[in-house]
From Swiss-Prot, chains A, B:
GO terms for molecular function: metal ion binding; S-adenosylmethionine-dependent methyltransferase activity. This is Probable 7-methylxanthine methyltransferase 2. Its cofactor is Mg(2+). PANTHER family: S-ADENOSYL-L-METHIONINE:CARBOXYL METHYLTRANSFERASE FAMILY PROTEIN (PTHR31009). Keywords: Magnesium, Metal-binding, Methyltransferase, Transferase. The keyword Metal-binding applies. The keyword Transferase applies. Pathway: Alkaloid biosynthesis. Belongs to the methyltransferase superfamily. Type-7 methyltransferase family. Binds 1 Mg(2+) ion per subunit. Involved in the biosynthesis of theobromine. It comes from Theobroma cacao. Theobromine binds at residues 27, 152, 155-156, 313.
């Protein structure tokens, strides 16, 4: 049976040692770095052609996961609106957040965390809903969303690209993502799946956005045209190496490793823009590539922390393919390799994000 | 520290033997019996003074819990709209469900169940959100809801009534709810807390309803003026008797039993109507008392099934007060007493519901 991404792509649940709640510090750094862009997009909702000021601002967070990240994004939106309304002297609208993720996401933990935001913004009238479902399909009613926001989600594909020979044999043996040694068919398969999926994210959002609505999408991407550049392949190469070690130890089947590819893609800014133009529902108001230094003296200076950062989002999918029982061994081995790479300065040192702000084209209003 | 109802009132989680998902069959019967009333209220949304037909129908289910009950309520709403639109020859609107319960509710299990409805209504454009929070406060933006529905939730109080003597001593010793032997202060305390809480449910919903919006509230209530009539006190008297047995066995402290009262109230139709009139935001379009026969040859013919039905909603709150470790013993003892009562025909034989359909008064439109 084909792997159903919707059942296995989620962030580690709860708030334990390896949970996403505890370990997704990098996403928080990306949120902090891109805050001015989100703020500007939010505030542009108040300077458009609306005949009356918005009474309710509907905000969606696609693939929000759980923990401090969605809460931080909510705070940024609330503060941006408070600031803008202060500036314009207009009455504060009510704000309704729609926190979206696949139904396998730990919404119970997400909801319990909302009290933090409640404490922080007692004087603002805001509401939070959980919206379970895939952003590769419809999620919200027509013309309902003023701001659709997503940080580090839409680089997840709806399924792993099909990368086999005509005879059905795996073409990406010993690897789980694009790599320097992968044949061209692997890169082509990944790019093609990304184009299809990212295009569907845009197509399904288009009817859902209110006129003049904005989308801010932040994807984990890459800087160069080369889809196998070290900074993006490093993580998956590292895990593939650790998996190969487990194969050599007889702990997992070689066939399981050879046939597996992660449903994830790091696009370049140019690839993102090309899909947006081709899909046609949105105008690009802003587009940029944002670089964060990692490793060394920066974030993730410690291999242990970095492995936790990798584990909290890759474990559910790896555990589904290779078994829960080998996960500790897998990440221990990966940490060992990473520590050695740190000594030799071989680890990836950059985290790349592609950020776009999109506006719904006016002729796209659905009735 | 005062007991916080929002942390302890929830239905048993998951889908195990004592779960609400498996054991809340009585609520399903209430939903089936009141279906024509809900249907009529939904369809009345399409025959009002709306200048244009609704494009999106926003529906809220207050205190929806989890399992088949909220899914069944969604089905009734969808089918009512499909039928009405067929009749009127109008285009189907999109439907957005807001499934509300306290943040302690098991939303993860609730969301996983949505696939059942998805399979059933593939050709209808509907969306479901989880809306965590207390219905004794604001939950949704202004003027947003067309239908607010609630089955067997708003009889839960925001807190247990304070029933002590002037010296602070408990007045409802050995009981956990109103009972034949309770002094008048107990009944007064309960009624007063219900009036305050039910009034706040109405007051907080009023700004949230769209013009011409409807509320359908179904409460577990009583038939007569006497708030200690057998059919409503039976459950809590039974549990109090089982708790007293555990006290006599030294398994729980007498003081814990004496000071405890459940935050629950079974109002009469007249009490419900009086609060609605006094609060003033809504016109009552329909009001009735609905009786279901239980026990004997009807639903819950078996004491074991009936105890599971009681346990799935009372366990979290009892377990918080008396400890998880005594729950099996408590419900075993209660089943023993119940079985004896069945033999002697002493058990409650009626389940009473109060049903009201309310329309937002036109001068209550909030801007």
């Amino acid at each position: 049976m084909a792997m159903k991404v919707k059942d296995i792509v989620f962030m580690n649940k709860g708030d334990g040692e390896n949970s996403y709640v505890k370990s997704a510090g990098l996403t928080l750094k990306v949120i902090a770095k891109t805050q001015p862009i989100v703020q500007k997009a939010v505030q542009s909702l108040f300077t458009g052609t609306h005949s009356t000021p918005l009474q309710v601002v509907n905000v969606a967070d696609l693939g929000c996961a759980l923990g401090p990240q969605p809460l931080e994004s909510m705070s940024i939106v609330i503060e941006s609106i408070v600031e803008k309304c202060g500036e314009l002297g207009c009455e504060m609208p009510e704000i309704q957040f729609h926190l979206n993720d696949l139904a396998g996401n730990d919404f119970n933990t997400l909801f319990k965390g909302l009290s933090v935001v409640q404490e922080k913004y007692k004087n603002v009238s805001w509401f939070a809903m959980g919206a379970p479902g895939s952003f590769h399909g419809r999620l919200f009613p027509r013309n309902s969303m003023h701001l659709v926001h997503s940080c580090y989600s839409v680089h997840w594909l709806s399924k792993a690209p099909k990368i086999t020979s005509e005879a059905g044999l795996p073409l990406n043996k010993g690897k789980i993502y694009m790599s320097k040694t992968s044949p061209p068919a692997v890169r082509e398969g990944y790019l093609s799946q990304f184009e299809e999926d990212f295009s569907s994210v845009l197509r399904f959002r288009s009817p859902e956005l209110a006129p003049d609505g904005r989308m801010v999408l932040i994807l984990n991407g890459r800087q160069s045209a080369d889809p196998t550049e070290k900074d993006i392949c490093y993580l998956w190469d590292l895990l593939a190496e650790a998996l190969s070690y487990l194969v050599s130890e007889g702990l997992i089947d070689e066939e399981k490793l050879d046939s597996f590819n992660v449903p994830y893609y790091n696009p370049s800014q140019e690839e993102v823009e090309r899909v947006i133009d081709k899909e046609g529902s949105f105008t690009t108001e802003f587009s940029d590539t944002v670089v964060l230094e990692i490793g060394g003296k920066n974030a993730w200076s410690d291999p242990g922390l970095r492995i936790k950062g990798y584990r909290c989002f890759s474990e559910p999918i790896l555990s589904h393919q290779f078994g829960e029982e080998v996960m500790d061994k897998l990440f221990d081995k990966a940490e060992e390799i990473l520590a050695e790479d740190y000594k030799q300065g071989k680890e990836a040192t950059k985290n790349i994000s592609i950020v776009v702000v999109l506006k719904k084209k006016t002729n796209q209003t659905w009735t």
